[in-house]
């Protein structure tokens, strides 16, 4: 069995006797992009901080590349972007990373290639002071800080927070490109469901500190069905559809729900219903979305 890049076992965190995180088991596989979703205050940032040893869990075990995080050497394998990074506003991107390099001791030769990878090494930007950066450029610089150590794992907490749609698209494409070209494992948190749906291989949803869902993004997208709106006599419709070996998932006097069908089979269903004197006003293919799952699991009762 392949060793996970990140594994949490029976991890919980209490603040003032309130359990804010309670994760029985969470694994991030090597080389995947794992989307960590949840409402504000669900425990996403606390979980990431525990993985980075910035917050100590009340109980439980955390492993990175199969080793317990009590061995601090594991941190050299992780690049992180947690909350808003601190910069020296009167320095350039290179100078900021050089200060970082002097603190941590990684190879100075990594700095320019890293800035090139995040799009901050061109003539227009190389001499620009960070105080003059747009928010999107600052997010790129934050990614550079995470990447410059040449990590194998990236932890990104809300990396598109505060960006406009164009900026979100830019950062999303950059993360995808870096993950695939470098073979990185990426653990990314967000409350923007559509962005996670675009980048992640697998998602976990945390709600009130508990992991309430985990699944493959492709499996979510493959859950499709057909809905037919109209006026139906249920018993008559069921009998008629049985003659063409179609069995509804659900049926009412106003709606029929069927498993996913080919175009030809949908045409046959419609023809059969019309012959049964049903009035039809809508036929629609439906696909389950991450938003459907998220809202269903996190809605307040």
Where are these predicted regions, by residue range?
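Conserved ABC ATPase "signature" region
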Residues: 98, 102, 109-125
